[in-house]
Amino acid sequence: MSLVIVLAVALTLPATMLLIAKATGGGGNVPPHRPEGPCDIYAAGGSPCVAAHSSTRALYAAYNGPLYQVMRQSDGKTLDIGVVQPSATDAGGYADAAAQDAFCANTYCWITTLYDQSGHGNNLTQAPRGPAGIPMVMGGFNNLPVADWAPITIMGHKAYGVFIAPGMGLRNDNPHGTAVDDQAEGQYWVVNGHHYNGGGCFDYGNGEIDSRDDGEGTMETTYFGNATPWYHGPPPGPWIMTDQENNLVGCVTTNGTKDCDLPIITWRFVTATADGEPHHWRSMGGDAQTGELKIMFDGPRVSKRYDPMRKQGAILMGNGGDNSNRSDGTVYEAAMTAAGTFPTQETQQKVQASVVAAKYDVPRLSLTPRSAIDTPPGLQTFSPNSAQDTTVTFRNTTGVPVTAVKLSISVHAGWTSVVSGASETSKTFAGPVAPGTSVSATFKVTSGPVAFNGDLVGNAAWTTDGVIQSETTTEKVRNVSPIKINEFAVIPTDSFIELYNAGDSDVDLSRWTLTEHPTAQPIFSSIKFPDGTKLKAKGFYLLGLANSGLVVPAQKGDSTLYVRNTSGMSVGDTIEIDTGSDVETRRIASIRTAAGVSTTLWQPLPDGPVITIPVGSTRVPYTGGGGGFGGGGGFAVEVGQKLGLGYGASFPAVDNTIENYEVVTVTAVDKPGTQTYLAQDAKAGDTTIKVRNVRDIAVGDKINLDIDSVSHGMETITVTAVNTQDGGGGRGGEPGTLVIAAPLKFNHANNLPFSVRGTGISFQPATTFAHSSNEPLLPLGAGITLDSPLSSGHAINAVVRDAAVSSAGYQGPPAPDQWFGGPALANAGSMVLRDASGLVVDSLNYGGIVDPWASEGYQGPTSGLFS
């Protein structure tokens, strides 16, 4: 190839793609050619990719950049997972799962970023809050996927898909080059056909840039699941459909029903497409392991409300346009084509051929309790010096017979693993194992005497055509005292947590902690067990929620306490502050108000989604009215009141840090942040724009409009006047008018969403810490005053207990072994019990998967891991 040709080709590729020219001699080893990927095919067909996402393989033959990023729980460090490079016998191009396994050994990892391989920078990251979402992480962020929950085989090698459980989702609300309005666009994805539910909405594709429901036709994505409130196929599903906002659409009918003649999908791996253009859309689907795609629907738009479409261009994965995130599913690869392109059926069939050639298959190796081979819990809990039967299963996904399959388990120092009923540490199957069949061996695993959180490692080695190959897999284990979170209650006058010692020996709980984490809130504290606390064998330990607790720390010399609750308290009552050796007793001198409902520091969309207010600030933007996702409705704060400003978060938000409050005094309460829409088309050159709601917009506000795409452009405008009436925030309200400082540079469509930060809450003194979007803003109220100052300081959530109160807190019987002051138990949350060294002893989620890593039990398709 000449230099001129090399340069010509290189100019058509993203910057992360490399063409490497090698001078080879006559007998040199030349790696196998990496075949063209789906995005090469789309480009050749005239519909190049504008977004290309996969955790399993490169979607271009020449792509050598990162596929995704993982972050580990133990220290917050991150690692980009790239593609395996070619070797003499291997074309490479699949994900480097071994790098992830090494980096994430003995801890948990999250997928923080799914990189865009197209070169347009359309990476997918943690989905921000939205009104239809289950608020999981601080302020309403979605949870991130756990990195190893979806193992598979691709191109004969291990890789991991993106596993979505309810509450999880990835998104990009500020994309580049995606279709907007009625522009054409194509999409495809490969998913697990056995992992789905009827919750909304397991989608991939084009959504709203404000993570809200902006009306019919404001999104167009693929959808997979068996939801029935909208268009749907015959029961029980699942079906390949699309999501076009306020409608899951599998077809368009003429008889007034929403019953579609769609096939019930039974394939383990599924390819699906969703292509839309003016007046027309088409969906196709097929078995990702064999054959061609079939037409699911090819015809007109649903109704005039969807024709023309009003797409906005955001990119979402695993959730809906309004962040509805109640879905289950697993994504392996996906892509969107450029604005104004409509892939032909021939192009989509070639993409399907590329998917089939990638040879997706179930995981080759699993490590599970013997009793749960098909539904592995992902975690086994031992007590020191105990034994359990653990099974290693090898499934031949090579496509040819293999021989000499050897299975074993690698264990932590001080542990042992032997074949059940024998003394050997491995088991070998000499005869051929046919493609698609499995062999397994069960081992007696005995834990050591030392407490441990980490991995068991399952090993397999086999021979193919005289070549020995191997693979490993892991299972999380805990080797800890047999203390269980036995039961709890979330009742205003009966909130408690009970521990149980399932062992035959007493256990010392000195300096253990229990972290109770309410959904959508950061973690501020843990319940601490005092020195000398022992839990008898087969005994119970009861933690009771006190009628009140500190919402911010109290300092030595303070006479005012800011508390969670004052209901039932009376002047003159004796109260206890804290517990154990730290307890102080005082009388109540006066009672004013308890802490109010928190809101969050404003999260702007589509710009943002995280803004940081620097040290030295005296004003913060805030979420008004509804109180944000951290505290529900009812947020109110007044001049002169104390306000707690949360700080200490890290991003992405995974509830892996401890939050704190700094306390300020409010000096002014001005306009909150707001999200609203253009009320009519705005044209380049205009110096006024019509908007739905001007109530919280002020002179001087800067507004970011639109996205960077074909016939559209991003620009920042400055408001110089706010004229006429308030639109009331609704779509039917009378619009208001904004006068702007300079003429518009681009055209912008009616219904375009935008955000305004507002003039915020002012306070003194200036901040000594930085504060970021979605961190809590807590009105502290006026608190209660004491008859004398405190003799020592007390931490946030320390007990404030008034024995005379019967209307709040745990009332018994029986009396608790220990009181705790907060946080109050919520309707959803997680609990994590740790020993004195910080090892996790027990954990659970309730009311939702608030902290996925703390989940115990099988997470996956109802039909099992290998089906």
Regions found by a protein language model. Name each.
Residues 375-386, 489-491:
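Short, solvent-exposed loop/linker segments at the N-terminal edge
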Residues 474-520, 546, 570, 580, ...:
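A structural motif detector for short, solvent-exposed N-terminal "entry" segments of globular domains
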Residues 36-39, 533-796, 800-805:
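Autoprocessing Asn-cyclization modules and mimics
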